[in-house]
Amino acid sequence: MFRLLATNKTAIGLDPRPSPATHVVDDLSDRVWLRDLITREKITHIIHAGGVSGPMVMADDPVGVIAINVTGSMNLLNEAMAGGVTTFVYCSSVAAIGNFYEQEPIGEDYPMWPTSTYGCSKAAVDYVLRGLWKKMPLDICSLRLTAVYGPGRTTEFTVDTIVRAALAGKPARLDPLTDWPYIYVDDAADAAIAACFSQNRKQLAYFVAHPERVTPEDIAAACRAAGYPVRLEIDTSKPIAARGPVDVEAAARDFGFRAKIGHREGIRRMIEAATR
């Protein structure tokens, strides 16, 4: 939100939880209320980044995940169409793809085989957007974010697990995974803003990632370089979570986005923020 305001755009933050960036507290369940908000505030562009934020959240409540991520998204999309919004950017996830590992970067047309309810919820909305793309006046775009990390994240994923263990002087316990692509939170925000106001997008979906492919050992090395060594304990009895390279050139070509913050700098910033 703060990066959007820095572009001199008038912005309204909507979230179910109050925060300094939240102007409206809402959960996207009331379509009539959403339509009134869009009309009253003369909303022209929507960046929809809300909802259940990862497979680790509400993993035991699939009905709740679908209600928030699918029904809530459909409510917002429907009222955007009815309210004359011009652009709708949906923050999807590489989790919509599921496990994959190709030697060459995959593109937007790679098959979606999600492996979690969260991933299924993201794929479901992506399919709806595919069905609507170029068939209505609303300009729609789906950004398939890879693993987002950085200061301020309240849920825990691989980077968070390793960094928090390093800060606590404890081992980091992980399930096995490949060398994943990641995206720092500030880069993810910049990508959403760039896509939202671009006039040159040529496709519906784009992957948003730093081109680095990062292993848990790389993350641990970055913690060590920042002064916080950590030992990894990998549970090899679990299946490997595979993610390979994704196409980042389409985003660069169509809306000028290239991730700037690699994992070493991103982890340094996380540790700095946590130790202030």
Predicted features and spans:
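Conserved Rossmann-fold NAD(P)-dependent oxidoreductase catalytic core, especially the SDR/UDP-sugar
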Residues: 74-117
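Active-site Tyr-X1-5-Lys
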Residues: 113-141
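Glycine-rich NAD(P)-binding loop of the Rossmann-fold in SDR/ketoreductase-type enzymes
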Residues: 29, 45, 64-72, 112, ...
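C-terminal "lid/loop" region of Rossmann-like NAD(P)-dependent oxidoreductases
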Residues: 203-206, 214-221, 228-243, 248
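Amphipathic terminal alpha-helices
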Residues: 237, 263-276
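Glycine/proline-rich active-site loop of Rossmann-fold NAD(P)-dependent oxidoreductases
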Residues: 123, 136-141, 148-160, 168-170, ...
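NAD(P)H-binding glycine-rich loop region in Rossmannoid oxidoreductase-like domains
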Residues: 28-68
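Substrate-binding strand-loop-helix patch
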Residues: 151-156, 177-189, 205-223, 261, ...
